[in-house]
């Protein structure tokens, strides 16, 4: 189950245990994994962190 969030970040939900989340971004043919292992309790904080990671990745000039 994958859904778009904001600023190019998507959330992949894994229905196991506490409901893990993986944050990712599709940049053309590249799949960028931003953060793995978040659960519902830390979701908003981890989304903000994933957005920061994606911004940093783009600033570094990655494709």
Language-model-derived ranges and their functions:
Residues 17-21, 25-63:
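Enriched for short, Lys/Arg-rich terminal
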Residues 1-16, 61-62:
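A short, surface-exposed loop/turn module that caps and links secondary-structure elements
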């Amino acid at each position: 189950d994958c859904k778009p969030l904001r600023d190019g970040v998507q959330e992949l939900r894994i229905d196991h245990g506490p409901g893990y989340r993986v944050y990712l971004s599709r940049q053309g043919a590249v799949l960028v994994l931003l953060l793995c292992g978040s659960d519902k309790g830390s979701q908003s904080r981890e989304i903000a962190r994933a957005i920061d990671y994606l911004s940093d990745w783009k600033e570094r000039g990655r494709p």
